[in-house]
Every structure is written in structure tokens, then in C-alpha cells.
Design a protein with these regions (language model features):
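Extracellular glycan-modifying ectodomains
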Residues: 1-136
Length: 136
């Protein structure tokens, strides 16, 4: 975040990011949209699919430590402040200590941040159970 021409640290940026999320949620709700916030996976410090290709017999080398709870709390804070439902998907990607590159038979991330289509499909049933019923 830039404030008055200065680039703020990650920690100093957090209140501004939350305020921006709250404003966005309220703008979306003003249109009549039903809004749900989803906290997603930690950003991988490597490209997991490339790492898996190089370490197919040593997949643990491709795992990484998840972001701290505080780093990941921005979306949940914004949801709490607006009273909307928040879904924490982090447990679908990582344990408390480690984010594996492969879960089941699927590579989780295609790059540092985006899920593979294959792993996304494995989440469909879980996700449908998380979403509130959106009646007419």
C-alpha cells in the first residue's frame, strides 16, 4: 500500500487493506449481491508444479510453511466487520505446519498462487457444503 507517496510495510498496510475490503463488500452488497468472503491458501515460495516435476520421488522437498494466521486474517476481519459469512479454505491446502505440493493424486498449485484445475475439482463437494443457501 502507498500512503502519501510512501510505500508502507506489510504490517502497516493491513488496516488499509481491511478498510478497502470492507468498502468493496459494502459496494457489492448495495447492488443486491450476496457476498461470501473466502480465505484461500498461502502463497507458495516456489512453483510447486515445477518442484514436483524435479522431485517426483521426494515430494516433501516441495512443501512449504503456511502463512501465519495473522497474515491470513485480513479477509476474515473484513467479513466480521460487515457481518457476512467467511469460509476458511486454508485447512484444505495446509496443515498447521506444512502445505504439501500434492494432496491425494493431485498437484495443488500450478504456480505460486493459483490452484490446478484438477485439485480445484477435488474441492467441489467441500465447497458446496460451505456456501450458504442462496434463496431467491
Amino acid at each position: 500500500v502507498n500512503r502519501n507517496g510512501a510505500t508502507l510495510s506489510r504490517e502497516a498496510s493491513q488496516p488499509y487493506l481491511v478498510r478497502g475490503m470492507v468498502r468493496l463488500i459494502r459496494r457489492l452488497e448495495a447492488t443486491g449481491a450476496k457476498v461470501v468472503v473466502m480465505r484461500d491458501q498461502s502463497t507458495a515460495p516456489l512453483t510447486p508444479s515445477d518442484c514436483v516435476a524435479r522431485n517426483i520421488h521426494h515430494l516433501r522437498r516441495c512443501a512449504f510453511v503456511p502463512a501465519s494466521r495473522r497474515e491470513r486474517a485480513l479477509e476474515l476481519t473484513a467479513a466480521r466487520r460487515t457481518g457476512i459469512k467467511a469460509i476458511d479454505a486454508q485447512p484444505m491446502f495446509c496443515s498447521r505446519r506444512l502445505c504439501p505440493a500434492v494432496i491425494g493424486d493431485a498437484i495443488v498449485n500450478k504456480d505460486n498462487y493459483h490452484l490446478t484445475a484438477t485439485y480445484s475439482r477435488t474441492l467441489a463437494r467441500w465447497m458446496s457444503g460451505q456456501l450458504p443457501a442462496f434463496g431467491g
